[in-house]
């Protein structure tokens, strides 16, 4: 079998939900640490530093994390994927 290599382009974002996570977090007046603490109650463990990297689109996000973020932020999953043009 041929091996497929993943090409990493450091100039490209690793997720598209980061800016919306930040937007909804700030709308609620929450710090990154508070969001991390609230996620632990589900329990989904994303530390404050990982939330920062997620919001900066540096970190990838799993489907479980996306569902937990939407639930914790009180928004539909689709809202995390909305793009502002």
Predicted regions mapped to residue ranges:
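Short alpha-helical DNA-recognition segment
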Residues: 29-53
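Short, basic-rich loop-to-helix N-cap that marks the start of a DNA-contacting helix
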Residues: 49, 56-68
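Residue-level detection of the helix-turn-helix DNA-binding "recognition helix"
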Residues: 26, 40-41, 56, 85
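Short C-terminal boundary/hinge segments that cap the last helix of small helical domains
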Residues: 63-67, 71-85
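Alpha-helical residues within the helix-turn-helix
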Residues: 26, 37, 71
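Residues that mark the N-terminal boundary/hinge immediately upstream of a DNA-recognition element
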Residues: 20, 31, 35, 62-65, ...
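A short, Lys/Arg-rich alpha-helix, primarily the initiator
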Residues: 2-28
């Amino acid at each position: 079998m041929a091996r497929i290599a993943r090409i990493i382009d450091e100039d490209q974002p690793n997720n598209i939900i980061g800016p919306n996570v930040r937007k909804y977090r700030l709308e609620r007046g929450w710090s990154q640490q508070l969001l991390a603490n609230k996620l632990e109650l589900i329990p989904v463990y994303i530390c404050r530093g990982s939330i920062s990297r997620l919001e900066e689109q540096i970190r990838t996000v799993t489907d479980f994390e996306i569902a937990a973020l939407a639930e914790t932020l009180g928004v539909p999953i689709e809202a995390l994927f909305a793009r502002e043009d």
